[in-house]
Amino acid sequence: MPSKVLIIGAGPSGTACAATLHRLGHEVVVVDKATFPRDKCCGDGLTTNALRILEGLNFDPSRVADWQTCSDVEMRSFSGRKIDLPLPSIGGQFAAIAPRAQLDHALVEHCRDMGITIHEGCAFESITHHDTNGISVRVENLGELTVDYVVAADGMWSPVRKSLGLSTQGYLGEWHAFRQYIGNVHGSANEKLHIWFEKDLLPGYAWSFPLPDNRVNFGFGILRTSDRSTRYMNDLWRDLLTRPHITAVLGEHFVPEDRHTAWPIPARIHDAVRSSGRVLFIGDAVCATDTLTGEGIGQALETGIAAGEAIHECNTAADVRDTYSHKIDSLLLADHRMSSVLSRMLTYPVVARMVLALVDTNNWTRKNFVRWMFEDEARAVVFTPRRWHRQFLARPGAYSAK
């Protein structure tokens, strides 16, 4: 029997959930407090996994004006070692950069073209009724909506979670990131994706992701600790853009655009609240980000699809919750644990240097490491036999038929 579902939040997780439920025959309404297009603090990078999921949702990359594929990656160790990591240049897309202002808007329009109702400028206000028979929600400009399930795709601070009394007091995320668009780029960053493992960022890193028209998305991600204050991170941000090995790849006359933005990164899928009654949490609301790289778009899409499938497959709210949690465990838990271990190891400079030296052993290690890093295979695939297959690190990328 079709369910009526309200999705709160029209980012990648919310739209993926909406598209999944609609395809399976359910009645879906999506609301978002913002009006699109709107910017979203993000590195804008899409891994192979995220690209394959978008393809599976029948999303057309040509909807994104500044969609930029990339096959050349350079990593630099704090020791000065540079490692060229070539992704396949044929056989589909393995990495892409898509500005979130454009990507999220395009996903909203993609859902609308499917016939899904999306209300912009309509913020969640409160839950007015919630029991075993249904849930009612008050939404700005729409009044009270009564549905079978609510899917909260409303971000790390999740007003829905807060309204249910499920927020963690003082939680600021596991990581913090800064980002700024930079124009007039004429160095190698114009075409190549750069990653810098700076000693004062470990286990984090700085990045430069190429965009059309001599622009890049430049930023860094850093583990949040008690000795890394906001002031420390602001000072670090200003210093990064003066380091010679970074300015060299941007070119002499690069121009930062507008102001930099910063955002917390939630990465605790192992103990985050996943559901409550008839409410499921997805994306950043369920803290699904990869704790090794900070990648979150692929994980957001996966949680959205998992929530939609759980609602479709089950007849009771209890079964929906259990099925959704099982799907999350199957999709993300082993990878999260692997990423957590690797992240802790990379905190130590001597270990980070050894790992990067190992990556640079030969062409085979470089080729396969970069495909693993960009989630061509799951993080913990070696330890999860159920995910083994004959085309290990040899599958085509996304959109290979185009």
Residue ranges and their predicted role:
Residues 66, 144, 224-310, 315-318:
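FAD/FMN-dependent oxidoreductases across multiple families
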Residues 1-13:
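Beta1/beta-strand and adjacent pyrophosphate-binding region of the FAD-binding site
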Residues 51-105:
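A conserved beta-strand/loop capping segment in the N-terminal third of enzymes
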Residues 110-248:
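Predominantly flavin-linked oxidoreductase catalytic cores and closely associated redox partners
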Residues 13, 36, 157:
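Conserved Rossmann-like nucleotide-cofactor binding loop
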Residues 8, 22-42:
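Glycine-rich FAD pyrophosphate-binding loop
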Residues 309-402:
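C-terminal helical "tail/cap" subdomain of flavin- and related membrane-associated enzymes
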